[in-house]
């Protein structure tokens, strides 16, 4: 069975660019001009797969946060979508990324209220393993 914390750390390492694993991210980016990339272990769904086997769907969210203007948004949207596509079919920590979802792609509220781009892509990794119980 895959450890979701190790998976999140592997995703952050693969992204590079200062990406960091956090468990309760909340940012006010006043005075911060550089982009922040945050990786959060988001959930695990387990179901029976085949006789004596289980399928885990491990979900990791990648957030890009940056103080910006509306003119910066298209490039930031392309970047968050690109992160998701880059992980599809990629193996990290022994599991394969089977899905990347941006829904919504970014938070219009954060853009209006904070002048901050907050975009999230949720990566779903699949693991099939023997039920050891």
Predicted regions and their residues:
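Charged, amphipathic alpha-helical segments and their flanking helix caps
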Residues: 1-27, 42-133
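A short, hydrophobic beta-strand-centered structural micro-motif
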Residues: 32-43
């Amino acid at each position: 069975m895959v450890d979701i914390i190790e998976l999140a750390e592997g995703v952050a390492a693969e992204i590079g660019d200062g990406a960091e694993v956090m468990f309760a991210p909340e940012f006010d980016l006043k005075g911060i001009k550089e982009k922040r990339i945050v990786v959060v272990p988001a959930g695990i769904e387990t179901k029976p797969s085949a006789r004596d086997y289980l399928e885990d769907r491990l979900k990791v969210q990648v957030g890009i946060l940056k103080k910006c203007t509306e003119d910066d948004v298209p490039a930031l949207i392309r970047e968050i979508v690109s992160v998701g596509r880059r992980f599809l079919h990629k193996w990290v920590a022994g599991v394969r990324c089977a899905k990347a979802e941006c829904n919504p792609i970014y938070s219009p509220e954060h853009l209006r209220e904070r002048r901050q781009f907050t975009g999230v892509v949720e990566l779903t990794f699949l693991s099939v393993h023997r039920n050891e119980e």
